[in-house]
Amino acid sequence: MTLFSTRHLDMINVMTYDFHGSWDTITGENAPMYADSSETTELARGLNVKYNKTVSLVSLLLFDKATCIQNWLDKGAPASKINLGMGTYGRSFTLQSADNSGLGAPINGAGQAGPYTREAGTLGYNEICEQKGQWTEHWNDDQQVPYAVNGNQWVGYDNVKSIGIKSEYVKAKNLGGAMIWSVETDDFRGICGDKYPLLNAINSVLNGQSVRPAHNRSALFCILYFV
């Protein structure tokens, strides 16, 4: 049965990010493509059920893009109206100990604010790129996203590789497109390589071309939509 009528909706922008942040007690990825194996085990244990992909209550509590989108599809939302949300920023944490810096490490709270976003617990991809020499990047193979560590600072974010994987998922599921939050925290100066690398990674996969957004000083936040 359809969860609700989508007849009068042009599109459904699914905000599949902010799955973890400084409100948690441990480090976690901002926008994982897939669930972490330990996360699914802990949820199953807490619900007293054996985990499998057909347990709807467990899947509703999993914090990852693939499960989230599949829930929308299973409830009857048309794939052609669903846009997968992607973030051009990361969620950061201050570790309790720099010696324990993996996924699920205990934290003392939000990470240090960046010079532009100026919000503890958030770093734009552009800010991460500006400090790239200070960070040690790790690839989270389970969840298909990176995280980086700098002393007692930890950030889970997206890079060109993970954004490309998510864009391929959009194609594989025949979704309507993708949306990002938001263009001003992409690497618009090209410090990590080409300008707007995340934006262009999406567009390259979905449309086979790159884009160069025009600057608009009056617009602080922009959401871009791709079909």
Tell me the role of every PLM-derived stretch.
Residues G46-K53, N71, V149-Y157, V170, ...:
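Short flexible/disordered coil segments
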Residues R91-L95, D99, N152, N159-C222, ...:
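Acidic/aromatic/glycine-rich contiguous surface patches that form carbohydrate-binding/processing clefts
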Residues V55, Q131, V205:
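Residues that form generic nucleotide/phosphate-binding pockets
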Residues G114-L175:
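Hydrophobic, secondary-structure "cap" segments at the distal end of domains
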Residues M1-I128:
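Substrate-binding surface in catalytic domains of secreted glycosidases
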